[in-house]
Each structure stands twice: as C-alpha cells, then as structure tokens.
Amino acid sequence: MQEIDYHVIKRSLSGADDECGDTGLVREHDNQCFMALIDALGHGKEAFDVAVLAERYLAAHYKDDLTALLKGLHGNLQGTRGAVAAACRLNCNTGILKYSGVGNISIKLFGSKTKRLITRE
C-alpha cells in the first residue's frame, strides 16, 4: 500500500491532555485508508465518555459503507449528549476519496490544491 502521512492530535480544554470530546481514528485495510473525526458535544469527562464510545464503535465497524457506518454510530450514541462526525475512505489504488459527515464538521485535503469538504444536508 502507498505510504500515507496522517496525524491525530487531541488537546483538552481543561484536565488531562487526552481527556476531551475530540477523537480520530485511522485504519488501513485492503489498499484503502479509513479516517474519521469525532467531536462530542461539550467539554470534559462527559464529552470524553461519548468520544470513547464513538471511537469504539468506529473501530469495530470501519469497513462498513460510510452511510451505514454513520447511521449505526447515530444509533450507538442515542441517549448520550451526542457528537458530530466525519468519515472518509481513500482508495489508495485510484486516489478516489469518499466522504460523509453529520453535523458542523469538515475535513481538509492538502496537496497541490487545498480543498475543504463540508457536510451538507
């Protein structure tokens, strides 16, 4: 598989550096790279708990179709404070990127031309 650089950095508003409602997940499989971002509503321990729940769901279902994945994540987060999410899958052979998101979240592609992908209704 072609080498891909990626980084996930989390910074807490207060408390432990990694105890926040922001998280990301990257998984490589079958010449594809799955990437997801989660931003749980609010701050602190409660937001962190939602982010952990979301990350666990994504880790178990990252090979699913993106639409089905986000619908499943929505169901998995029922009863929590909720989160916004973005997920994409890059086919490393073709360079085709598929993207889906829910809520006020976006991803940015960097290269010869920078492009921002936002979620639309």
Labelled PLM ranges:
Residues C20, F48-K115:
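Catalytic core of PPM/PP2C metal-dependent serine/threonine phosphatase domains
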Residues M1-L53, S106-F110, R116, E121:
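N-terminal entry segment of metal-dependent catalytic domains or homologous docking segments
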